[in-house]
Amino acid sequence: MLLSTFPALRASFFALPPSLRRACYATATATSHPEIFDLASTKGLKIALIDAQSLAAPSRTGNADAGGTREFANRCSSLTPASVKFLKRIGAWENVEQGRVQAYTGMEVWDGVSGAKINFDPLDRGRVAGVVESLGRLVPGSALGKSVGEEGGGEVATMCENANLTSALVERVSGFEGVEVLDGMKVEGIELGPEKEKDGMSLDLSLWPVLRLPGDRRIAARLLVGADGANSPVRTFADIPSKGWDYNQHGVVATLQLDQLHDASAPRKAYQRFLPTGPIALLPLPGNKATLVWSTTSALASHLKSLPAAEFTAAVNAAFRLLTTDVSYMLTHSTASQDLDWRESQTDLSALGLPSDFPRVEGVVEGSVASFPLRMRHASTYTGHRIALIGDAAHTIHPLAGQGLNLGLSDAESLALQLATGMEAGMDIGSCWCLDGYGSDRWGKNNAVMGVVDKVGKVFGASAGPVVWARSAGFRVIEGMGWVKGGLMRGASG
């Protein structure tokens, strides 16, 4: 069973072979005892899909505007080609509303202090593809010969609203017989089940996790998968410690309207500028819309959320277009559009590193500005007795690289493969023998990505002269080496 508000966990069900999906359907005991499920998950086998929020189709996207067109939601994710390939393989991607997703093939990143920049484009992927395939010919039978084209169509990533992906996964899972979707239902508690001798049970549940649901319903799980977020009750129940820290920052998100109306077939770019207070990113959505992710101090995040729409728009333009000293001044004094225009007229935008094709932000969708705290957390292990952690319950990462959901989807794929292997061998899916391979596969990989992202954030948050000089020099070196940029793009694309 899966209790799920987390897309990656729902995805794990589809990654199982059909014969094993059927094998995972649960049987219920007498009503006085807990219902027994092979797999239960917070945040997709009998399969109970439990979510505290409604998963009905209308929640797929944002509210409608005055003309009846549905606005884009402010919570979007950047899906790598590897993640999209996985979603296609499990049959979920075909349910995604394609008119509301946007692939991008390039990305420009620049230093807000020095103006040094890196321009990632499809040509860089082609250069590294040539190097990789040449090496593959020198090492017959190795994975080096794998073509870049096998991973995707040249895109860096694809933007998709979280609600769009969630609805697609729910639509997919609802097509299977024996699946029970329990949305709008909150888990009230987790406890160990009763002993066979004391409760007249045919099965000893004393070491099984039992979920308490509204209406005195109880569910016992042979395996409980926790994908219930950074403050995971499943992780707490399993007494699995985690290490990490808060960044004392918030990620401000919003849906923006740009001055450029893009043709659906035109190539799109993402943009990211590293400011001393944190990175700000503009990621493309269809048409003239984009999603904003601005990592900044908690105080500034509160200030930004309090601004009227016109002043918020001016603040976003300033953060991309002005010197960092001017950005700081405008965010603490005035963000009037006329002040922005005057300061921009006095700024050498090319020396600033601003891309020549960078769009101007014309407005912000009403009600779309929000924020969330930024933190890094990593569980000491992903598994316990009849417990597996996945996604944010296992690891929380800074959003500057947009890898959070992608890591979670990779977790889901790995866990599903491990369960399929164990079930084919006749293993108890809640046993350490079945689960250990999942933790061994994912913990080190996730830890490496988290470490790199954390260090990149700290390097770009430093304002000391030697650090600024060193990172700027690094930018310029990488910008001049196409095959290095291509390698970075391949890594970021999964």
Task: Annotate the PLM regions.
Residues 99-238, 243-255:
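Conserved N-terminal helical subregion
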Residues 417-494:
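C-terminal helical "tail/cap" subdomain of flavin- and related membrane-associated enzymes
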Residues 371-389, 447-448, 458, 464-468:
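FAD-binding beta-loop-beta segment adjacent to the flavin cofactor pocket
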Residues 1-33:
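N-terminal mitochondrial targeting presequence
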